[in-house]
Swiss-Prot record:
Protein name, per record: Uncharacterized transporter C36.01c
Entry keyword set: Membrane, Phosphoprotein, Transmembrane, Transmembrane helix, Transport
Its membrane topology: Multi-pass membrane protein
One GO term of the biological process aspect: spermine transmembrane transport
Length: 580
């Protein structure tokens, strides 16, 4: 039989094959085979790859593995092609492809229908992260939350050793505090690279690279013999550590619909604050013990490497574009058909495109989007207060009340409890938010995220004023300033969390970039606060230094109310929200 006759009679699609609907074939003389649409038969060819390359037919060669590969005789009679896969009579890769629900019932391309060469996942595909089962999502959510906790822990675990470092290397206390500030500076610069990478390669690749850098440089800090090495390695550790800050929240947006996304981001926000608050407690006791400050970094490194292992073993890609491209690549490897492709693969990215459309997007958002700038500014202030309090609490409790190292960090527990109270308050608002989403036609309702932030805007300055004046009078029992953390922690969590949720709902299709913009600003602010915290509390006194922060927090109270009433109008004028 000539090649042209084969080309004319070869099946045009595999809908019936993939649905297991092929019936028994009737043997016909050579040259008189009917097409699959008339008589659904399977034909053996030397290789399925050659069939696809020569005839441009996709996934039609679901043929038995046994038989004469040099003849074009009809395959064994098939009543149910899936039974062949069970019997092992199909080549394993083809059997795997046949069992994949993403390829079942799909019409594949022919030269007459070239538009079908573009592969897209169905909206209800189980491969899409949004359609995963609850436990499948929880597995990835838990591991990503642990990775976020690890890098947040690493940002402050060395803070209690600042005095030890100053004494050991004969430097001033302000210079020693650079171990926190330089880590935060790495946080600030990293998102310019990592967030765009996650929108090109997927979420997992930058996580691997970033967490590896973070973990390696923690070991470098632990083994450093001079202060210069410590500071440089802290910076590069922060540069790698910022990946979960940009990518994890975006991955949660990939997995969770509007109704549950707020709860997922609550988990993320909680671990971002739990890490910096718990780490100084552990770090203080380690520094004071026979293990010494170096083990704060060794332990952090072990935690980072464990994150990488867990992500590699148990986490799946969540970014839809990357999932689709991986599916297409798997299909091409099995079938040999190089013509099928994902729509995203039609994009041709030049160096200029990558710079303008990816690398500079976070900076462009900060410069041109009032919502991104103002919300990130408020978020930055409350986030930076956490790192300022890491230096202010030792002044209040270690210097003022003579608490020993380690014990002086225990009052952070008050803020920690406040953070969990804030999580509870936020969860109470989730049903109300979901009703607003339904009213909006099952679309994100950014302004409906703001009522918890309104509550937090009052709790936050109240807690700061409470700490300032109860901490100023040293004869006041230590539990009183400690309890101020309940209001401070709850306020910080409610403001920070709803800032993230508001930005996510408003810029959902650029989630990684908008979070990168937020991380850049808040890390820059948080990196500077520890440098002047001690001097401010020494020179102004605990009462007035705390009051200054309280006055700034009070001045920011109107911000969530302004966005609640006018945010929709502001977003309507935004070119970027319309573009995305």
């Amino acid at each position: 039989m000539s090649e042209s006759s084969v080309n004319a009679d070869t099946p045009k699609n595999t809908n019936d094959v993939l649905n297991g609907a092929y019936q028994s074939a009737t043997t016909e003389p050579e040259g008189q085979y009917r097409s699959a649409t008339d008589n659904p038969s399977l034909y053996q060819v030397p290789t399925h790859g050659s069939l696809y390359r020569n005839l441009s037919n996709s996934a039609s060669a679901y043929y038995p593995a046994n038989g004469n590969m040099n003849s074009r005789e009809p395959a064994n009679e098939l009543s149910d092609i899936s039974s062949l896969a069970e019997k092992g009579e199909l080549e394993p890769p083809m059997a795997k492809l046949l069992s994949d629900p993403d390829f079942q019932g799909k019409q594949f391309p022919t030269v007459e229908a070239p538009e079908l060469f573009i592969f897209e996942l169905a909206p209800d595909s189980p491969s899409i992260a949004l359609n995963w089962t609850f436990w499948r999502k929880m597995k990835t959510t838990s591991i990503y939350a642990y990775a976020s906790l690890t890098i947040a822990w690493g940002s402050s675990v060395l803070s209690p050793a600042s005095a030890t470092l100053a004494k050991k290397y004969h430097i001033g206390m302000t210079t020693s505090l650079l171990n926190v500030s330089l880590f935060m500076l790495g946080y600030c610069l990293g998102p310019i690279c990592w967030a765009p990478m996650s929108e090109i390669t997927g979420r997992k690749t930058p996580l691997y690279i970033g967490l590896f850098l973070f973990s390696v440089f923690q070991i470098a800090v632990a083994t450093a013999q001079d202060i210069q090495t410590i500071m440089i390695c802290r910076f590069f550790g922060g540069y790698g550590a910022c990946v979960p800050l940009c990518v994890v929240a975006a991955a949660f947006a990939d997995m969770y619909p509007n109704r549950y996304r707020g709860t997922a981001i609550t988990i993320f926000a909680a671990v971002i604050f739990v890490g910096p608050l718990v780490a100084p407690i552990v770090g203080g006791f380690l520094t004071k013990s026979y293990l010494g400050w170096r083990w704060t970094e060794y332990i952090t490194s072990f935690m980072g490497f464990l994150s990488i292992i867990l992500i590699y073993l148990f986490c799946e890609e969540t970014y839809l574009k990357t999932i689709t491209e991986n599916k297409v690549q798997e299909y091409r490897e099995i079938t040999g058909n190089q013509l099928v492709h994902a729509r995203s693969e039609e994009e041709s990215l030049s160096a200029r495109d990558i710079i303008m459309n990816y690398l500079l997007i976070p900076l462009k958002m900060l410069a041109t989007e009032p919502i991104v700038f103002l919300v990130s500014l408020y978020c930055s202030f409350v986030y930076a207060i956490i790192y300022l309090l890491l230096e202010a609490y030792p002044v209040i409790f270690q210097e003022g009340r003579h608490f020993p190292l380690g014990v002086s960090a225990l009052p952070y527990i008050g803020i920690l409890v406040g953070v969990f109270i804030g999580c509870g308050i936020n969860c109470l608002f989730e049903p109300w938010y979901f009703r607003q989403v339904i009213k909006a036609g099952n679309k994100p309702a950014p302004e409906a995220r703001l009522p918890p932030m309104m509550i937090g805007s009052f709790l936050f300055p109240a807690g700061i004023f409470w700490l300032a004046w109860s901490g100023y009078y040293t004869y006041v029992h230590w539990i009183v300033p400690t309890l101020s953390g309940l209001l401070t922690g709850a306020g910080i969590l409610l403001i920070f969390l709803q800032c993230l949720n508001y930005l996510l709902d408003a810029y959902l299709f650029r989630a990684a970039s908008v979070f990168a913009a937020n991380v850049i600003m808040r890390s820059a602010v948080a990196g500077g606060f520890p440098l002047f915290a001690v001097q401010m509390f020494h020179n102004m006194g605990v009462g007035w230094a705390g009051s200054l922060l309280g006055f700034i927090a009070t001045a920011l109270i109107p911000m969530p109310f302004a966005f609640f009433f006018f945010g929709k109008k502001i977003r309507a004028k935004s070119k970027m929200t319309a573009q995305f």
